[in-house]
Amino acid sequence: MKLQERLGGANIYLVGMMGAGKTTTGRLLAQRLGYSFVDTDAVITAFRQRPIREIFAQEGEPAFRELEQQVLAQVSSYHHLVVATGGGIVLNPMNWSYLHHGIVVWLHVPLAVLCQRLRQDRERPLLQEQPLEERLGELLQARQHLYAQADLELRITLEDTPETVCDRLLETLPCILKPMEPC
C-alpha cells in the first residue's frame, strides 16, 4: 500500500525550533506527497498584513499565541496538508488537541546548528534581546520536552539538506502508521 493511502489524508504537522527548516522541508514534503502546504506564520502574517515581529512588538506574545491557536484550529479542520508551525506552537496545551488530529513530526536540530542558521536573521522577535546562543538555548530547553511529545522525532545535522530530511521523513513515516511496517 502506498504511503499516501496509508496516511488517509491525515495532516502532517512539522514542529521544532525556529531555523529547523520546517517551511522548506514542509514544501518539499507536500510536493512529494501530493498534499497542500500551509505555514501558520505565513497565514498570520497575511491575515494581519504585517510581519510577526511587528505583531509581537505592538500586541505582545500572548496576542500572537492566541492568533496562532485560531489559525491552527482552522487549519486542523482540513486534510491532505503538510503544516509548518511556529516554533512556540507547542507551548499552548490546547494546540496539542489540534496537532493530535494528524501526525506530529519534530525536526530536532542541535543548538549549534540553529545558531549557525540564525546568526544573520534579524526578523525573529524572540531573538532580539540576548546573545543568540544564550537565547536559543533557553528557548530549546523550555520547549524540548514539549517537542518530544511528537509522534516522530527526526534528528537533523549540519550536513542534512532539505531534500535528505524529506527523504528520511518519507522513509520513516511508514514506521509509525498502522498497520505497522518493520523498519
From Swiss-Prot:
Its cofactor is Mg(2+). The keyword Transferase applies. Keywords: Amino-acid biosynthesis, Aromatic amino acid biosynthesis, ATP-binding, Cytoplasm, Kinase, Magnesium, Metal-binding, Nucleotide-binding, Transferase. PROSITE patterns: SHIKIMATE_KINASE (PS01128). Binds 1 Mg(2+) ion per subunit. It comes from the Bacteria. GO terms for biological process: amino acid biosynthetic process; aromatic amino acid family biosynthetic process; chorismate biosynthetic process. Disulfide bonds: none annotated. Mg(2+) binds at T23. It catalyses: shikimate + ATP = 3-phosphoshikimate + ADP + H(+). It is found in: Cytoplasm. GO terms for molecular function: ATP binding; magnesium ion binding; shikimate kinase activity. Pathway: Metabolic intermediate biosynthesis; chorismate biosynthesis; chorismate from D-erythrose 4-phosphate and phosphoenolpyruvate: step 5/7. ATP binds at G19, A20, G21, K22, T23, T24, R124. InterPro entries: P-loop_NTPase, Shikimate/glucono_kinase, Shikimate_kinase/TSH1, Shikimate_kinase_CS. GO terms for cellular component: cytosol. Substrate binds at D41, R65, G87, R143. Its EC number is 2.7.1.71. Belongs to the shikimate kinase family. Monomer. Catalyzes the specific phosphorylation of the 3-hydroxyl group of shikimic acid using ATP as a cosubstrate. This is Shikimate kinase. It comes from Thermosynechococcus vestitus (strain NIES-2133 / IAM M-273 / BP-1). The gene is aroK.
